[in-house]
Amino acid sequence: ILYFAGNDGIHGWELWRSDGSVGGTYMVKDLREEECDENGENCSNGGSLQVWCWGSPFGCHYPEIVAGNSKIFLTGFDGEPGTESAANVIVSDGTASGTQTVRHQWRNWDPAYGGENGWEPGITGARNLVVIPSTGFVSDRVVYTVMETIGGQSVDSHPPFGEELWITDGTDVGTYMLANIVPEDESWEYDGANYCCGDFQGSTPRDLIMKGNTIWFTAKTDAYGRELYRYGMNVGGGLFLVKDINVGTSGSNPMHLTSVGPGVYLSADNGTNGQELHYSLGNTFNTVVVKDINPGVNGSSPQELTKLGSNLFFTADDGENGRELWVSDSTEEGTFMVKDINTNGSSSPNWLRVMDGTLYFMAYTEDHGRELWRSDGTESGTYMLRDINPGSNSSFHWTPDFFHGELVIVHGDSLYFTADDGEEHGTELWKTNGTANGTELVIDMVPGSDSSWPNRYLSFDDKLYFTSYSEERGRQLWFYWDNPGPIIG
C-alpha cells in the first residue's frame, strides 16, 4: 500500500492510502477536522499535515512519512487545543481506528517560559524521522528529534526539554528520550520569581542515519560545538561522542553522513584542512581525514555522497577544476577526481543515482547545459548519455536543495527522471536503460510544448508513482506501469 499526503478540497491535507486503483485510494482518517470560530463561521478545512506550497511548478513541501513493516509514522497536528504550534509524531496501521497522535510533546507554554521580557523559546516539533523496522518480538519503531514540554502543566512541574533524540514504537509508554545530550540547566526570572531549570535549545541532532543497530548523527554542545555522535541500540550500547574532530568549542560541522563498508563517510572541518572528506569506524582513533582535496584551510566541501559497492562517489572542489565528480575507497591514494567534465569551470554534478553498478547523474557543460551523464568510475567511462535539449540549453534545471522530492529514481531496470527537451514537449517524464538510444520520452502527458511537471517519484511493487499537473485537473497522483504500459491517473 502507498501512503501519501493528499488534499481533497474538503478535509485539508490528511494521510491517504492507495493500492493503485480508484476504489482503493482513500483518506485514512480526518485527524484534524474542520475548525470554525465561536459563531460557527470562518471555517477552515482543518488538515493534520503541514504542507507549504509556493509558486514553483513543482508545488509543495510535504511532511515526513516513513514506513516500517506494519506501521506508518509521520509528523502532523490533530487539532488538540494548545498543540497547534508544533508537529507531533502520528502513528498509523492504515486504518482510521489505528491512526492517532503518539504523544503531544509540545503544547502552548506557561507564560513563565518566556522570562521577564516575554521571550518565547524557539518551538521545535517532531522531525528527522528514521524508521527501525520490526525484528522478532520488537515492533516497528522510529527515532526522531523533538523539543518537549507537556501542556496544561506549569513550568514548575514540567520544565522544557530542548530538542534531543527520541524513540517511539507508537505507544505512549514506548516513547522516551534516548539521550539528553544538553541537560536542563538554564535558569530565568519571571514576575519576580526565579525558575530553574530548563533547556530551550537542546543538542539539535541532525543527519540521522541507521547503521546496523547504531544511530549515527551530529549534535551541538557548548563544550564541543557540532560534532559526530553515535548511539548503540543493542545491550551495552548507549551514547558516544565519536570524536571531537575540531578540538575545542568551534565544532567541525559534520554533515552528509553516508554508510559504506564498515564505516561512515562524512564532510567535516577539523580546523586545519577546511571542510573535507572524513571516514570513521566509530571512535576517536579511526576517524580521519581521507584526503586534503583542496589543500589548506578552504576545504573542498564534499557533497552528494553516494555509495556504489565498496566505493563512495561525491562532488568536491579542489580549488583548480571547480566542483567535479570524485570517487574514494577510503584511502588517500584511492581518492581522486573521476573526470574534469566542465573544463572551463564547475560541472556541479547532482542527483547521483546507482543502477546496475553504474552511477548516473546530472552535470553541466558550456556546450550542452545540464544533461544526464553516467560513470563507471573511470575517466573514459564517464560520458553524457544524450543531449536531450540540443545545444547549450539544459534539459534539467533543479537542485536537490531547491526541490524536496524525487526527480530522478531507479525503477525496475530503468532510470526515470524529469526533463525538458525544449519547445517540442516541455517538461515531462523520461527514462533511460543506460544507452543513448534507450534514453527516451515516456509520454507527453500534456501534449505539445506545455509541461506536466512530473515529480515526487516513488517506486513501489511494479509501479512508478508520481504527481503530475494539468490545467484541467491540477496536480494529481499518477502511476506508470511498464507492463502493459499505460499511464493511469
Predicted regions and their residues:
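Feature 14080 marks short, conserved micro-sites in well-ordered regions
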Residues: I1-G489
